[in-house]
Amino acid sequence: MGLETEKADVQLFMDDDSYSHHSGLEYADPEKFADSGQDRDPHRLNSHLKLGFEDVIAEPVTTHSFDKVWICSHALFEISKYVMYKFLTVFLAIPLAFIAGILFATLSCLHIWILMPFVKTCLMVLPSVQTIWKSVTDVFIAPLCTSIGRSFSSVSLQLSQD
């Protein structure tokens, strides 16, 4: 607990004179914040979650709201997204991390101590099972299929047009 040291990656500049028909949102330079701490998503698992206001809300050229409405909506969207994410992570991150840790530990234990020994045992036993299965197939199934094949080979079919 202490002072918040993270920097925001979005800045809103609300100058009334510079707004025309665009949103006026100027994103901060990504290189500026690249070395501001550790990369929390080094494998880019959640790169699809980088949504901006324009990805969610879009007004076609023919139907524009007032510039002030657009600016306020944009600001409220960004602020509410930021605040709600922080609020939810305060209450959910630690319990969900604990549950995920228990789940992954359980699955790892089951995989290491139950599943892999079972698979290795099956792979050791399979050559002898394969030999027995081949013998059963040669003794019972092959003669049956051969006799059925010979029976059907003597059947002839002739079509005539009347």
UniProtKB/Swiss-Prot annotation:
Q: Which UniProt keywords apply?
A: Cell membrane, Cytoplasm, Golgi apparatus, Membrane, Nucleus, Phosphoprotein
Q: Which residues lie within the membrane without crossing it?
A: 87-107
Q: Name a GO molecular-function annotation.
A: D1 dopamine receptor binding
Q: Which domain of life is it from?
A: Eukaryota
Q: One GO biological process from the UniProt record?
A: endoplasmic reticulum organization
Phosphoserine occurs at S20, S23, S36
InterPro entries documented for this protein: Caveolin, Caveolin_CS
Which locations, inside or outside the cell, does it occupy? Answer: Nucleus; Cytoplasm; Golgi apparatus membrane; Cell membrane
Residues recorded as bearing Phosphotyrosine in the entry: Y19, Y27
Topology: which residues are Cytoplasmic?
A: 1-86, 108-162
Membrane topology field: Peripheral membrane protein
GO CC field: caveola; cytoplasmic vesicle; focal adhesion; Golgi membrane; nucleus; perinuclear region of cytoplasm; plasma membrane raft; sarcolemma
Primary localization: nucleus
Record PTM: Phosphorylated on serine and tyrosine residues. CAV1 promotes phosphorylation on Ser-23 which then targets the complex to the plasma membrane, lipid rafts and caveolae. Phosphorylation on Ser-36 appears to modulate mitosis in endothelial cells. Phosphorylation on both Tyr-19 and Tyr-27 is required for insulin-induced 'Ser-727' phosphorylation of STAT3 and its activation. Phosphorylation on Tyr-19 is required for insulin-induced phosphorylation of MAPK1 and DNA binding of STAT3. Tyrosine phosphorylation is induced by both EGF and insulin (By. similarity).
Q: How does it assemble?
A: Monomer or homodimer. Interacts with CAV1; the interaction forms a stable heterooligomeric complex that is required for targeting to lipid rafts and for caveolae formation. Tyrosine phosphorylated forms do not form heterooligomers with the Tyr-19-phosphorylated form existing as a monomer or dimer, and the Tyr-27-form as a monomer only. Interacts (tyrosine phosphorylated form) with the SH2 domain-containing proteins, RASA1, NCK1 and SRC. Interacts (tyrosine phosphorylated form) with INSR, the interaction (Tyr-27-phosphorylated form) is increased on insulin stimulation.
Summarize the protein's role: May act as a scaffolding protein within caveolar membranes. Interacts directly with G-protein alpha subunits and can functionally regulate their activity. Acts as an accessory protein in conjunction with CAV1 in targeting to lipid rafts and driving caveolae formation. The Ser-36 phosphorylated form has a role in modulating mitosis in endothelial cells. Positive regulator of cellular mitogenesis of the MAPK signaling pathway. Required for the insulin-stimulated nuclear translocation and activation of MAPK1 and STAT3, and the subsequent regulation of cell cycle progression.
What is this protein identified as? Caveolin-2
What is the organism of origin for this protein? Papio anubis
- Recorded name of the encoding gene: CAV2
